[in-house]
Regions:
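Hydrophobic alpha-helical
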Residues: 1-38
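Flexible, solvent-exposed loop/hinge segments that line or gate ligand/substrate-binding clefts
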Residues: 31, 50, 95
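Hinge/cleft segment of the Venus flytrap/periplasmic-binding protein
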Residues: 58-117
Length: 117
């Protein structure tokens, strides 16, 4: 089941357990702490991790350009909101599963600790 976020993904799992049903393959979004634990326990199948450090780095790069009186770095794409073309600085989301969680969170001691304990 594709869920719009991790909270609902965990609610699906809880509901299935409560009804005595098998847990289906459940995907979430946001890489919430409880869902990382659930993935590691073999319940939730996956979540989508958004690379926050990359997002912050891109934001700082844009702000630094503005502080220097420069234009924002060129965006690879844009979307018209009905008024203007809004630049899009897309970062690749990362699908996290039990099979790759350790690798994905290897540089994140807080998240890695969730897998160890």
């Amino acid at each position: 089941m594709l869920s719009p976020n991790d909270g609902i993904a965990r609610a699906i799992i809880t509901s299935c357990k409560g009804a005595g049903q098998d847990i289906p393959v459940v995907d979430g979004l946001d890489a919430e702490t409880e869902s990382i634990k659930s993935i590691w326990a073999g319940e939730q199948y996956s979540t989508v991790h958004k690379p926050t450090k990359d997002l912050v780095a891109k934001t700082v790069e844009i702000i630094a350009a503005f502080q220097k009186g420069e234009e924002a770095p060129a965006a690879e794409e844009s979307e018209n909101n009905g008024v203007i073309d809004v630049p899009i600085y897309a970062l690749d989301p990362i699908v996290v599963t039990e099979a790759n969680a350790e690798e994905i969170f290897a540089e994140d001691p807080d998240r890695l600790a969730l897998l160890e304990g």
